[in-house]
């Protein structure tokens, strides 16, 4: 293969991730390198505009400049301003400058990243964004220096997430037989960022060449719409936790205004406290405490304020957290149920949450324990459970990464990998034999849905039959074949021996008549042994072969499924 490099830029509301992957013979598929800025892989999507000279600072530098007390404006969440007409122009200016900053950082690290001469760059965007915004984002990457219109591409976040999911979970997906060639599945992606949470529901399929098709039927449901924002982003939790702490501080400072220093410390440190302490503690079902910095400041102020109350920090366990943030989870619950209802209107294979086959959860805000609990059918904050039956029955169908903020960026650089999805059966197959319309065999499940193809299965049925010693009456042995998700909902089809069928996926019911006569005298008990052999090919076509042996006499039959 020719060596080349893919750069993936996931430009998020509060955080940006840039990944680089080199493609060459013998590479490790899952290897990719992050653009490291300030010692971290997560770049805060921040721009600080200093007042006196208009100088711009980006990422952690912007954060440091703001905390140092420099006079100016800290621009945050400006990605969302692309959707607001009166703020759009300023948002475009900031995004262009931010992309230039990323490219300058890339150039500094380019030697260590071993970048090839041939480079492709991908930038992600929400599936619901308009063509106008997508064009602007791609052009911003081109203008920054990452490439030309021929080498810079856009990719939807759900598509990128699928590539990351398959790269990191390929073995499990095969083991659980969750994906197969030419078998569409219903996928729901929940992307929870700092600004918003978005649900995307679509049909996914891998073709015979293992090429991925997202919304292959042209139907991708993205909810909410561009002009309808639900307040389900991480910054809403920040605000609610700020209020929780502020209520405590008002009890500590009764009858007076909370000290400005405490207010500022509460607001500036809330995100780090949330991510490094509150979320991990609640994940383990343990209580969280106020940050050490806040407690130190309270103790210091207490020595100067004798009226301060010595009140312990209220226990922030799961119950208290869900009470304080109930409105947030109610909106997320509504967002999800509305998205599924919308999908049910346009995707015939989806009637409700029980029809979702695979769920992908991404974004930094998805790390809250409440998200997993809700997806697994548990009640959160007193809200009714959502019946994601297939996910509840098999939690392995709920996929997330250890670092969910990096999922989309990883998927952007993994998109050129080849995936080995084996040929598998689209349906279950059951066979039952019946002698003379009155003596049935057991029902044999000879093939399971998602079973690897090609495969050969067989079973044997032995039955006693009485007849005259000179003549055994004609025996009719019928072979009933049924395929599908279950026997109750299967289609029915009747055909004779050697009937030509299109494929295994088109057959349902077969009847084969096997008349034979044995000559003799007197009365005897005959042993009738029927052997069935099923051969299913890679393309899903199947042949059922049968041998009937009655005291040495054999009748053969073949059914083409």
Regions found by a protein language model. Name each.
Residues 24-144, 233-289:
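Phosphate-binding loop and its immediate beta->loop->alpha context
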Residues 332, 420-561:
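Acidic low-complexity intrinsically disordered segments
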Residues 135-140, 368-390:
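Conserved helicase motor "Helicase C" RecA-like lobe of SF1/SF2 P-loop NTPases
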Residues 58-75, 230-376:
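Gly/charged contiguous loops adjacent to phosphate- or pyrophosphate-bearing nucleotide/cofactor binding elements
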């Amino acid at each position: 293969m020719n060596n080349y490099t893919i750069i993936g830029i996931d430009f998020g509301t509060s955080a940006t991730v840039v990944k680089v992957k080199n493609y060459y013979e013998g590479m490790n598929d899952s290897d990719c390198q992050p653009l490291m800025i300030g010692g971290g892989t997560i770049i805060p999507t921040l721009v600080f505009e200093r007042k006196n000279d208009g100088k711009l600072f980006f990422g952690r530098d912007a954060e440091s400049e703001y905390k140092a007390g420099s006079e100016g404006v800290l621009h945050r969440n400006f990605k969302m301003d692309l959707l607001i007409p009166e703020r759009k122009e300023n948002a475009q200016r900031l995004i262009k400058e931010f992309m230039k900053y990323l490219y300058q950082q890339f150039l500094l690290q380019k030697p260590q990243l071993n970048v090839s001469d041939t480079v492709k760059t991908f930038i992600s965007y929400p599936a619901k964004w308009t063509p106008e915004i997508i064009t602007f984002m791609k052009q911003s990457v081109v203008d920054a220096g990452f490439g030309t219109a021929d080498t810079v591409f856009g990719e939807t976040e759900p598509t990128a997430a699928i590539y990351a999911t398959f790269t990191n979970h390929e073995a499990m997906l095969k083991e659980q037989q969750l994906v197969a060639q030419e078998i569409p599945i219903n996928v729901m992606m929940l992307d929870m960022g700092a600004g918003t949470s978005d649900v995307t529901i679509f049909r996914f399929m891998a073709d015979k060449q293992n090429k991925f098709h997202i919304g292959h039927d042209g139907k991708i449901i993205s909810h909410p719409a561009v002009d309808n924002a639900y307040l389900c982003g991480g910054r809403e939790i920040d605000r609610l936790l700020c209020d929780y702490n502020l209520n405590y501080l008002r009890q500590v400072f009764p009858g007076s205004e909370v000290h400005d220093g405490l207010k500022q410390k509460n607001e500036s440190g809330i995100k780090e406290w949330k991510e490094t302490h509150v979320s991990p503690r609640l994940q383990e079902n343990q209580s969280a405490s106020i940050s050490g910095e806040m407690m130190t400041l309270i103790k210091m102020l207490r020595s100067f304020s004798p009226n301060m109350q010595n009140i312990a920090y209220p226990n922030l366990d799961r119950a208290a957290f869900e009470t304080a943030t109930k409105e947030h989870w109610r909106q997320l619950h509504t967002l999800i149920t509305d998205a599924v209802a919308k999908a049910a209107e346009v995707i015939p294979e989806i009637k409700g949450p029980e029809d979702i086959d695979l769920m992908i959860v991404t974004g930094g805000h998805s790390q809250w324990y409440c998200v997993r609990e809700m997806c697994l059918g548990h009640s959160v904050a007193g809200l009714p459970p959502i019946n994601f039956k297939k996910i509840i029955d098999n939690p392995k169908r709920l996929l997330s990464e250890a670092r969910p903020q990096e999922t989309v960026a990883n998927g952007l650089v993994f998109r050129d990998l080849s995936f080995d999805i084996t040929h598998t059966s689209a349906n279950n197959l059951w066979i039952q034999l019946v002698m003379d319309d009155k003596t049935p065999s057991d029902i044999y499940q000879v093939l399971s849905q998602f079973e690897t193809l090609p495969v050969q299965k067989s079973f044997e049925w032995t039955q006693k039959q009485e007849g005259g010693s000179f003549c055994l009456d004609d025996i009719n042995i019928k072979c009933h074949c049924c395929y599908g998700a279950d026997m109750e909902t299967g289609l029915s089809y009747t055909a004779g021996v050697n009937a030509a069928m299109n494929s295994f996926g088109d057959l349902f019911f077969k009847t084969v008549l096997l008349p034979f006569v044995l000559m003799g005298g007197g009365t005897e008990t005959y042993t009738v042994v029927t052997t069935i052999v099923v051969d299913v090919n890679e393309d899903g076509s199947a042949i059922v072969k049968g041998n009937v042996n009655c005291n040495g006499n054999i009748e053969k039959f073949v059914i083409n499924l």
